[in-house]
Design a protein with these regions (language model features):
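Residues lining hydrophobic/aromatic ligand-binding pockets adjacent to catalytic sites
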Residues: 1-171
């Protein structure tokens, strides 16, 4: 499979359409395979999706209910490998619906993101949750935590949107 992936990525028009790869099979996370993959991605300037699903599985060890109990498809339970292989990185943070449970994980992400941004990397941060109604609040919490460490970060675009006018009553 490695050769198939490398052939695909070699032929991909990376200069006009940057791409990142998310691997899920545990074989890709074994040290020899991970090093080989990361080296090749660096050579090509291809990003690696940094999937962080730890909250999905760690919460149960802290007595919290399984946030994926009603999910049709469970999130991959793979080791986090915070390796940047291109001039950008894509962090896919799968949050726990309990905002407070995310604090430890978010706090640990901040220095990494700071370092990558200081090194001139572009960081794409994709945050979602099995209970998608919680995703906006968790995304805001994550960004506010990062902004607390990096006050020069711009405001989130949705902070600039004027609230809609209140609808007048029809009766």
């Amino acid at each position: 499979r490695f050769n198939d992936l490398m052939q695909f990525l070699t032929e991909w028009p990376r200069q006009t359409a940057p791409i990142a790869v998310e691997v899920r099979h545990l074989e890709w996370f074994r040290p020899a395979q991970a090093d080989r993959l990361n080296d090749w991605l660096r050579q090509l300037g291809v990003g690696r999706v940094l999937l962080d699903s730890r909250t999905m599985y760690d919460g149960q060890t802290h007595g919290l209910p399984d946030p994926q109990f009603t999910s049709e498809r469970r999130k991959p339970n793979v080791p986090l490998q915070p390796v940047v292989t291109a001039d950008f990185c894509l962090v896919r943070y799968i949050s726990h619906p309990d905002l407070n449970f995310n604090e430890t994980y978010v706090t640990k992400w901040v220095p990494r993101l700071q370092a990558w941004l200081a090194a001139g990397k572009t960081v794409y941060l994709f945050i979602h949750c099995p209970d998608e109604a919680q995703s906006p609040a968790i995304a805001r919490y994550f960004y506010d935590t990062l902004k607390g460490a990096m006050p020069d970060l711009p405001s989130l675009p949705w902070d600039e949107i004027e609230p809609p006018a209140a609808q007048l009553s029809l009766f």
